[in-house]
Design a protein with these regions (language model features):
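Bacterial N-terminal signal peptides
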Residues: 2-12
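Bacterial Sec-dependent signal peptides at the C-terminal "C-region" and cleavage site
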Residues: 10-20
Length: 137
């Protein structure tokens, strides 16, 4: 038990000692951060940032909580997604209403849950662009 605790502490100390990657360092100039991030991205990741998917099925409501759906987790694991569209929509097209979809409070929780998942479960942790009517420019 003591050995396990010591190993966990050492791993935590080692992780804290690692320097922050330039693209994650808010004190650096934006141009330097962007250049660093682009140099780390694969072609697939760059193309993936242009990918926009319909997202009204990317969350599950569990009481007063919202969590990423298994569909969302699968899509994130299988490929790069840079933008979600229609995440918050309630209309006949999505078959969601304020009763079956997201209230304003749940919409905020959904956005946070999806962003957190992508940041924590992708290689570079690039946040999503969330939009409702972005296709019009």
């Amino acid at each position: 038990m003591i050995m396990t605790a010591a190993i966990i502490c050492m791993a935590g100390i080692q992780m804290m000692a690692q320097p922050k990657l330039p693209y994650r360092n808010a004190s650096l100039p934006i141009e330097e951060r962007v250049s660093d991030l682009l140099s780390r991205m694969t072609l697939e990741e760059k193309v993936g940032q242009l990918r926009c998917t319909l997202a009204w099925n990317y969350y599950d409501i569990k009481g007063n909580k919202v969590v990423p759906s298994s569909t969302f987790m699968k899509d994130i694991a299988e490929g790069n997604i840079g933008m979600l569209w229609a995440t918050y929509r309630a209309c006949p097209w999505t078959r969601k209403s304020l009763a079956t979809g997201l209230t304003p409070t749940l919409a905020a929780k959904a956005g946070n849950a999806l962003q957190r998942y992508v940041i924590e479960h992708t290689r570079l942790g690039i946040p999503l662009f969330l939009a409702e009517e972005a296709p019009h420019g």
